[in-house]
Amino acid sequence: MLRLQTPVTDERCKVGISYSDKIMMLGSCFSENIGVQLKNFGFDVCINPFGVLYNPVSVLNSVERMLDIRQFSLEDCIRIGAGDTRFCSFSHHTSFAREEAETFLLDANMALEEAAEHFRKCNKVIITLGTSWCFRHLERDFIVSNCLKRPAAEFRRERLTVQETSAALQRIVDLCVARAAEDPGFAPKQFIFTVSPIRHFKDGAHGNQISKSTLLLGIEEVVSGLSALCNCPDGQGVTADYFPAYEIVMDELRDYRFYAEDMCHPSSQTVDYLRERFLAWALPPEEHQLLEENIRRFKHSHHRPH
């Protein structure tokens, strides 16, 4: 039989997920798409409590804020630009924007408190990185999660290096290890990293590849470094792993029919396929029957007869 694709043969997951886990998902909208499906199918998941985050430093900033439970204040409130008069913050996606600053603060701090409690108890953290490009607010000297349509003159566009990417991710791991050592109520955490298959074509095909390659190399440094610290050949005790979502779309699916109309975002069919591949990789075999039952139950409850 002719072989018509190059399948991505991912190794068996060393950091799996289970229905008994509490999971935090942070990062790009791909993380959000998969996270919503996991929640629909019965997993205990908190998804992007600051909204979609694209770069590694913004993910680190969100983790630090959850650990400190550092609430947002009026100083953090920014009026969105380009004629949008709503309020948000440079730490949030615009999905958090509200008409009044006080309403934004109320909702943002409520989400923060709920997320901080979930993060304290969760034992699995799944981080999906979208791009190594970021924007630094010049006056505040702060890498923002979202520019909020503010004037371009307020920012400097930067591309994180491999070292800066790996340092941000390693800092997340180190902070969690340190907190677990000093706080018995803080659950030790294992991490799954992945790179979003969403293509950022603002800088063209070559620029997108450079950005994604930076993320891949940064993740590889962290995962391989943590694996080297674990001397267990069977993978027991490993604290980080990598799921090849980007490679599956680029090398296995490899066709525009698996993309949405913008030719950059994966189609809903592709998201479903990646979720199936992820759970086949991460979920223990004995829980697949429960997964199928939960999928059937969800589809039945959301079925609308014609």
Spans of features found by a protein language model:
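Extracellular glycan-modifying ectodomains
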Residues: 1-231, 236-306
